[in-house]
Amino acid sequence: MSYVKRIRQPIIAVLGHVDHGKCLLPEERVILPDYGPITLEELFNMTKETVFKDEEKEVRKLGIRMPVAGVDGRVRLLEGPYVWKVRYKGKMLRVKLKDWHSVAVTPEHPFLTTRGWVRADQLKPGDYVAVPKILPGKDDKEKFLQYVHEKLKGKVHIKLPSSDEEWETFFYFAGTIFGRENSVNPEGLTHEVKALLELFKVLFEYPREVLRVLFMAPVRYVANFLRGFFDINGYVNGEELRVEVRGAPHEVLEELSLILLRLGIVSKIYPTSLAISGRRNLELFRRYIGFSEKQKAKELEGIIRRSENSESYPIFEELRRIRLLFGFTRAELSSTIPLYSKYESKEAPSYEILMKILNTIEKGSKDLNKKITILEGRVRDHEYIEEFKREGLIKDGKLTELGKELLEVWRNREFDSRDVNYLRNIIENFVFLPVEKIEEFEYDGYVYDVTTETHNFIANGILVHNTTLLDKIRKTNVAAKEAGGITQHIGATEVPIDVVKKIAGPLIKLWKAEIRLPGLLFIDTPGHEAFTSLRARGGSLADLAVLVIDVNEGFQPQTIESIEILRRYRTPFVVAANKIDRIRGWVIEEDEPFLMNIKRQDQRAIQELETKLWELIGKFYEFGFQANRFDRVQNFTRELAIVPISAKYGIGIAELLVLIAGLSQKYLEEKLKIEVEGPARGTILEVREEPGLGHTIDVIIYDGTLHKDDTIVVGGKDKAIVTKVRALLKPKPLDEIRDPRFRFDYVDEVTAAAGVKIAAPGLEEALAGSPVIAAPTPEDVERAKEEIMRQIESVVISTDKVGVIVKADTLGSLEALSKELQEKEIPIRKADVGNISKTDVMEALSVKEENPKYGVILGFNVKVNEDAKEVAKAKEVPIFVGNIIYKLIEDYEAWIKEEEEKRKRELLAKVTFPGVIKLYPDERYVFRRSNPAIVGIEVLEGRIKPGVTLIKQNGQKVGTIRSIKSRDEFLQEARKGQAVAIAIEGAIVGRHIHPGETLYVDLSRDDAIILLKHLRDVLEDTDIKALKMIAQVKAKEDPFWRAV
């Protein structure tokens, strides 16, 4: 069948250096449920496994759960896979929130504000920044008791509390001690109280470990601790309607504020006091903590009754967005919420009012259908039309872009309770506090950061964020709605060509270029480890790659890894030479094309850039590539184009986008032509479970069109899965009305190139990195199954031969790792996709018994199951895991080398080396005839050591060398040509041995095998001669020695 062809947008992957300039000072703290509060420096030093290291930075594997803001707006515990240490010299900013903590960050580190994510150097006093309302702790009694027993081991001999009630009493007591700042006079105290006091001192190591213990202890124990503290130090301020702690040291107040977050209570910190106010906080205080003293408890009830409101939420734009999404005008809401309009402009609504607003909005507008007909022009209603004009939906009698968009949203009912629930989650989990001041200072030293799945974490009780390389391109969509807008796909970001033209319009005109591509599709999972997963028909899914190199650091290990991968997959690429803004004296003009920006620079800065570019060009030449600055390239098929950029400031992004578009169009046009209506082909990026949908696959479609209800064939664990598409989901476009954070659009079809989530039965066993093929007919299904099984069988290995066990996260990365191992002639017993299991360890153990060198497991981008860890540790099976293929293999090869050296050292320690000696014929060199015999000898061949047995020419044993002496010095060894005296235990001169006689070191068969098979490289010529001489002697009695 013949289908219409058109050019699709090219698929672009980003590899190489990850721009990681967003860091914090070493002393900034994160709070981990398993460890309590810990500075970033301590967190880094606590981890041992280095993933990457150079002169400027070090990345270590972390694998510890920590509080983050989840995509649904809730504070969650998610694993932070990596922690960074980066060398930094330059400006730092300390952001201090009003009546709260501060945090010191590099200028580009973003904070979540009511205006979205804002960089530290763009914050100003008065901006509102997100602070978590709750910090989850451990809340696991068994783990806490384990921690207590471990801590007290050998330190204190008292009976520990045995029940919850006793522990709660102890924590209450500890809180009172903390409230008195540990100033308790033990005189006159009972034995029981003294014991509790001793337990307090050891467990809490006052004041150092208080916060840690309180984040590891069950929350009810924490509540009792706080009650004890507030009973001693707490007051009810009836005038200000708040609970206060007065006169405590500021450090204690800061610790206390973080402890209160475990219960969802946000306090205010003043120089010498702490206050809890607002109805929500006071009610939580009463529920969890309260006062034991009746008068204070009564006063607390009084201020709660008089407190009408809780925290305020100045989320004016977000309120307008969700109101319009659900079809309300301001006037409509004002009938239910008095004076509603002020909450979108000047007065931040309190928690209580905001909840009332959201409850009203969630019910939807009764007049929505009427509003649709008005926007469609079918009905005229003067009042609504005037409202729509004020809202910016109608201008000059026509619908604006916003009006058109809302009409589509209302018609399709693209909103439901989940939109409201996201905002509820934000309000329940965060408060927004104003920036009080921002201090700037110079810093020279190490800074730290943590990588998390959601690109954010909580430091010093403040939410901070780190970004990806695509952020700068995405940001260009702000105020570019009329240009079509950058849209988010599953696993990809689409940049329409209109946006490229908007960013790079002047350049396109200057170069007289015509771009016919519909856009660019950037894969959202940058890095070489993701690239290896992007397979399509045996090659790379990516049509083109951007290799990002820090122009100041030059080639790094990940650069070399990326080049090798690009070469292996024959993927064309361009080079982005990043961080030109770090060149001394570089003049920055944000979002400016490089060719315009360079005209602002002085000669010295230009020369420095030229030098750095020539260094890069030289390195590329070493790897077999001709390279040049992009505007100097004569032939793009023969020369690599290097675009100097600053991802941080947007300099050179215009040229990069135009170059990608131009090269794709000129050289990849035939590849980009797809059959629009042809059956779809794609690659699975990820398999994940979605609430309400079951197991789904995130897929990049690179050919054809996929429809709902299509039959698809998908690569599975050990089979091809045939299933039917139940739903196709794409994220909502990134615009001001829809909320794309966790919402999907259900669509009937998707055309390449696109990222899509597929919901279908039976996807539990689907393999990341494997193909997805649409199959319209039964014959197509069979062909697709055969094709997919061929691909899987070519990568997944299962044999009985001696070899390593290989595990990877996707089919593509498994293939890449296996190829590298095969090229290095490292045999593979088993290669499969998935985490490392106990079965893998047992398989490696069976190999280890045959050949220890190969009894190992290599894992790329995978985790090790707990039971597998335990068995591997017990059976001493080495497991190597990492996310850089060559580094993984390097680590394994280094281990082999170390093991061989260790084995060699062990063999050297126990093996007997060959040696032949001759007693001097002169009787003067017989120093003692027996017990032991001491004689002068010369080593004729080989070597001798104390402890070796000597034999005669006829094979008869004559005794053992007890010691070797040269003049006044005892030796551990004597070699060929040395004249020494030796003491021989068991020999009598004149009976067993005689002056002038030749004696041989007695070797066993095992000695000979070890020497010739395992230690051949350490044997010298004289050792070989000695071995042959000994073999001749021993061959008379044992035929084995004839072969030596």
From Swiss-Prot:
SMART domains linked to this entry: HintC, HintN
A GO BP entry: intein-mediated protein splicing
Matching Gene3D superfamilies: Hedgehog/Intein (Hint) domain (2.170.16.10), Homing endonucleases (3.10.28.10), P-loop containing nucleotide triphosphate hydrolases (3.40.50.300), Translation factors (2.40.30.10), Translation initiation factor IF- 2, domain 3 (3.40.50.10050)
Claim: Translocase is one of the keywords in the record: no
Entry-linked InterPro entries: EFTu-like_2 (IPR004161), EFTU-type (IPR029459), Hint_dom_C (IPR003586), Hint_dom_N (IPR003587), Hint_dom_sf (IPR036844), Homing_endonucl (IPR027434), INTEIN (IPR006142), Intein_C (IPR030934)
GO terms under cellular component: cytoplasm
Post-translational modification as stated in the protein's UniProt record: This protein undergoes a protein self splicing that involves a post-translational excision of the intervening region (intein) followed by peptide ligation.
Binding site for GTP: 524-528, 578-581
Domain of life: Archaea
GO MF, one example: GTPase activity
Domain (tr-type G): residue spans on this chain: 451-668
DOD-type homing endonuclease domain segment(s): 173-265
Keyword Hydrolase: yes
Keywords (A to Z) from UniProt: Autocatalytic cleavage, Endonuclease, GTP-binding, Hydrolase, Initiation factor, Intron homing, Nuclease, Nucleotide-binding, Protein biosynthesis, Protein splicing
Other facts: The intein interrupts the GTP-binding site.
Family from the record: Belongs to the TRAFAC class translation factor GTPase superfamily. Classic translation factor GTPase family. IF-2 subfamily.
Function, as annotated: Function in general translation initiation by promoting the binding of the formylmethionine-tRNA to ribosomes. Seems to function along with eIF-2.
Protein name, as recorded: Probable translation initiation factor IF-2
Source species: Pyrococcus horikoshii (strain ATCC 700860 / DSM 12428 / JCM 9974 / NBRC 100139 / OT-3)
